[in-house]
């Protein structure tokens, strides 16, 4: 595979005199002339399941049918009604559609798309996926650090960032936070421009946008399209889907592709679309928006655009082999286009590129080569996650405050535990609460992967980082500190207020045990949450799991009395291991019958007077292994759950 054949973006490996990335002469020829994207006989089918559980049927649904066309440098709009297939076509062209059920060819300058096409091209999703707790500049720095080659110096990368900020008119808000639901940030238009800027960091020659005007008012939407028009004049091929643009936006289009029910209604110069529809008998009324007119024609819901048969015979040019009268409207329009001069001209031009279809193809969907190393990605992901943590006081500061308050409340309720029979119950109760509190506090870890799912999928597909870099980066910067710090605070507050065993070793064993419980529970939360799209579903599954685990923790029921066919469930209980370790740490060596000789006084034969007796009654071994086996079990569960979470992320469906 030669680099010249597959060049679709300005390369970053060389530098010119101004410090910005440069190119060789042959590569510049491709970049300067712009990238021409052609698509040949694109068909896309999906299998849809319907019916009830035992009567489910799988039906194959055709999303796109024999789509052909060419996208040249300029503004290339894909227009159509809801469900017409415009977003599907955009994803197919951008190599972001599930390859199963997909047929046809997409060529760049007559050559197959390279394996790293998704990294070389830019793709702006419909829902802006940027880190809201970071500033505009910090988001761009993250994109530059992971997508630009390491051969570029930090000074060159900063120059590139400043150039993009200036090009998109983000100078005034460059150091303002993008904003979240809790943090006031930039406007909707500035947020959309930030998303575009993230993709322009690599200076791609092809830029895809999925409905860039969604959620914007008419004035802001017009400003965004004017920006795209200005960018297209620099030689970029900009391809975007759009639903119903106003006329001031429509007149900016260079090329127009009309889709309905996955069929091609028109593909050609936007300025000639009205003339084409007039030639087949559909005239646009004066002062009517052409985009609205096209949708009215496709949907067949406007009698104003349909001429009478007499008028059509007099004024309209009949295409070759017109469809029958009883043919559905979509089929009629598709047949009209197939027999039009626009389609024939497109086929002639497509034949000039079809030579690349005969070449040996390289899969677009195989693993790409990243421009940065694992450690470099890990460092930047950890840095961004830590900034995001500090920028979310509701998730970080609030959790610490709640931990302090809860520790003080528990310390007040169980203050200064006595070494008497009541002390046994109180100790068991408070240790059980500490264990279960660590479990339920870890439910918040489900948001770690669910909230950022769309961001992760977009950045991973775009070649920002590896799955392993993202996973371990989140663990280092978010999971570890947010589970370790509360455990330390909780232990320091409650241990001395409760008056637990006055031994330094016991203090640190309790702290370590609470940390292990928190890590194991959080790992379980990640294993459940990975791949989930809704936080409430993952939270519900976590809560139900912990409720069952609590039953087998050792407090609510004596585990020695559980029937054999259910007793095996205790080995899957995180609270059981934490509770057993805390009991061993606290009860061993304690005497709860002060003043009595437990070896000679028969009054204690039916009572528990020592911690050792209590532990034996609970089925806890008095050997040193009786303590550390719980930590080993928690560590094994943590490794297993983290492995499951990583595999679920790795196998997550990353195509739309």
From Swiss-Prot:
Its membrane topology: Multi-pass membrane protein
Matching SMART domains: AAA
Tissue specificity annotation: High expression in brain, kidney and lung. Also expressed in livere, colon, small intestine, heart, skeletal muscle, spleen, stomach and pancreas.
Stretches in topological domain Extracellular: 416-429, 499-507, 558-631
An example molecular function term from Gene Ontology annotations: biotin transmembrane transporter activity
Residues bearing carbohydrate: 597, 601
Region (Disordered) location: 1-25
InterPro entries named in the record: AAA+_ATPase (IPR003593), ABC2_TM (IPR013525), ABC_transporter-like_ATP-bd (IPR003439), ABCG_dom (IPR043926), P-loop_NTPase (IPR027417)
Protein's GO biological process: biotin transport; lipid transport; renal urate salt excretion; riboflavin transport; transmembrane transport
Disulfide bonds: 593-609
Compartment(s) of residence: Cell membrane; Apical cell membrane; Mitochondrion membrane
Reactions this protein catalyses: ATP + H2O + xenobioticSide 1 = ADP + phosphate + xenobioticSide 2; urate(in) + ATP + H2O = urate(out) + ADP + phosphate + H(+); indoxyl sulfate(in) + ATP + H2O = indoxyl sulfate(out) + ADP + phosphate + H(+); sphing-4-enine 1-phosphate(in) + ATP + H2O = sphing-4-enine 1-phosphate(out) + ADP + phosphate + H(+)
Residues of the ABC transmembrane type-2 domain: 390-652
UniProt entry keywords in alphabetical sequence: ATP-binding, Cell membrane, Disulfide bond, Glycoprotein, Lipid transport, Membrane, Mitochondrion, Nucleotide-binding, Phosphoprotein, Translocase, Transmembrane, Transmembrane helix, Transport
Annotated binding of ATP, by residue: 80-87, 184-190, 211, 243
Residue span, ABC transporter domain: 37-286
PTM: N-glycosylated. Glycosylation-deficient ABCG2 is normally expressed and functional.
TM region positions: 395-415, 430-450, 479-498, 508-530, 537-557, 632-652
Enzyme Commission (EC) number: 7.6.2.2
Record's GO cellular component terms: apical plasma membrane; brush border membrane; membrane raft; mitochondrial membrane; plasma membrane
Topological region Cytoplasmic: 1-394, 451-478, 531-536, 653-656
Assembly information from the UniProt record: Homodimer; disulfide-linked. The minimal functional unit is a homodimer, but the major oligomeric form in plasma membrane is a homotetramer with possibility of higher order oligomerization up to homododecamers.
Role noted for this protein: Broad substrate specificity ATP-dependent transporter of the ATP-binding cassette (ABC) family that actively extrudes a wide variety of physiological compounds, dietary toxins and xenobiotics from cells. Involved in porphyrin homeostasis, mediating the export of protoporphyrin IX (PPIX) from both mitochondria to cytosol and cytosol to extracellular space, it also functions in the cellular export of heme. Also mediates the efflux of sphingosine-1-P from cells. Acts as a urate exporter functioning in both renal and extrarenal urate excretion.
Domain notes: The extracellular loop 3 (ECL3) is involved in binding porphyrins and transfer them to other carriers, probably albumin.
Family per record: Belongs to the ABC transporter superfamily. ABCG family. Eye pigment precursor importer (TC 3.A.1.204) subfamily.
Protein name: Broad substrate specificity ATP-binding cassette transporter ABCG2
Organism: Sus scrofa (Pig)
Gene name for this UniProt entry: ABCG2
